[in-house]
Amino acid sequence: MSWQVYVDEHLMCEIEGNHLTSAAIIGQDGSVWAQSQNFPQLKPEEVAGIVGDFADPGTLAPTGLYIGGTKYMVIQGEPGAVIRGKKGPGGATVKKTGMALVIGIYDEPMTPGQCNMIVERLGDYLIDQGL
């Protein structure tokens, strides 16, 4: 199965009538494995910041989580495993796997919990597969 299928069918899927705004699977080196059509272009320093926060949890809290130039306020996550960000009525969830970052971005009417469930479910599956 291609990485694009994971994005299209597992991240951009419908949940209770709602969809993520955009999603991607990114290598921890910043390489794009697959992304939705409207996923913002990640900058190298944004990927470095995300990877750095997984290695040393809490480093993004003072500065914010940046995805494609958009700043998200870092909210509670799972240190070393999940980073969650909020911006107005929307937000983002980043799940770290052994080799990748699974990223979902949402806006109303999707809830933070729905985004977390979609992103973390795929991330956990990839971890179980050794990825």
Swiss-Prot record:
What is the documented function of this protein? Binds to actin and affects the structure of the cytoskeleton. At high concentrations, profilin prevents the polymerization of actin, whereas it enhances it at low concentrations. By binding to PIP2, it inhibits the formation of IP3 and DG.
Name of protein = Profilin
Keyword Cytoplasm in annotation: yes
Instruction: State the source organism's domain of life.
Output: Eukaryota
Fill in the subunit field for this protein: Occurs in many kinds of cells as a complex with monomeric actin in a 1:1 ratio.
Keyword Cytoplasm present in the record's keywords: the answer is: yes
Q: Which Gene3D superfamilies match?
A: Dynein light chain 2a, cytoplasmic
Q: Which UniProt keywords apply?
A: Actin-binding, Allergen, Cytoplasm, Cytoskeleton
Can you quote a single GO CC term? cell cortex
Pfam families of this UniProt entry?
Answer: Profilin (PF00235)
Query: What InterPro entries does the database record attribute to this sequence?
Result: PFN, PFN_euk, PFN_sf, Profilin_CS
- Single annotated GO MF: actin monomer binding
Q: Report the sequence similarity comment from the record.
A: Belongs to the profilin family.
Q: Where in the cell is it found?
A: Cytoplasm, Cytoskeleton
PROSITE patterns linked to this entry = PROFILIN
